[in-house]
Amino acid sequence: MKVILRSSFVALCAASLAACGSGGGAGGETRDSVRAVGSSTVYPFAKLVAENFVRSNSDFASPIVESTGTGAGIQLFCAGVGADTPDIADASRRMKASEFAECQKNGVTEITEIQVGLDGIAFASAKGGITMNLTPALVYRALAAKPFGKEQTAKTWKDVDPSLPAEPILVYGPPSTSGTRDALKELILIAGCETDPAMKALKDSNKEQHEQFCTEVRSDGAYVDQGEQDNLIVQKIEGNPNAIGVFGYSYLEENLDKVQGLTMNGVAPTYENIASFQYPGARPLFIYVKNAHLDAIRGLREYVAEWAKSWAKGGPLAAIGLVSSPADVAARSAAAASEFTRLDGAELK
């Protein structure tokens, strides 16, 4: 896929973006290609959709797809309406209520939310490397800065639990701006933290302290932030048999010749286990569409339609690791992709 970046755009029009698209004022220019930004997990799927879109629609320009991380992508998306802002935010978690409010404040009032499929937060090691049956509690005790409110003293996995290997804790994972990191916190770390009833009760009595104790990751080198580069995490663990990597299931699926998935609560990170939500790290993936751009950016409707053509089980996205949504969710997503239903934000947290 040819990637094109534009730096000169028309200023935001007061009336509508479509007015901007008609001629370009203030010495600027409009975009002739769709621009999507966001999740590194969604990136390979969005990129493949873009490539197939160009093959099917040769009269449209190649979409611009950027891996910025979910949080940064939504921030760019919510910055305003106009050709200098993205048309789509790719997200490995649902938009937060605070992000939705920021969008509204900046005039991004018409947003369509589309769940494009499922993914799982995979824990993996090199082929022939360290193996263990992880649980949310074990991961939390190994990675928390203050496990259960106490000082972190574990240096090896055996320090966490006597049944685990006496190898140093070394985990390569996503940065704080990543949707994968958010999902790691929500699905694994908090679940592990709240195995202690006192920590669960703390959520009601002291929300900030609960957030600190349950989600803050240690910074002493046991957890290494690898930026929005999941392929680099694969390379790191491939080169160190005692290291563990955390990334989206699609990267595990893509690299099964090099790495192996670790079980969580005895459940392997497989397509079937993620689709059934038996795997504890299963999560939905989304794209958010800026409806104000639908009639102004050529190809935006068609690009979203290409997503809907691609996400079925056995389709092109499944071939690179996307897990299909349940039938009822997929039906709602297909409707949203054609009708561009407005997100009201009431269910966001």
What label would you give each PLM region?
Residues 1-9:
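Bacterial N-terminal signal peptides that target proteins for export
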Residues 16-19:
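C-terminal motif of bacterial Sec signal peptides marking the signal peptidase cleavage site
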Residues 21-349:
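Flexible loop/hinge segments at secondary-structure junctions
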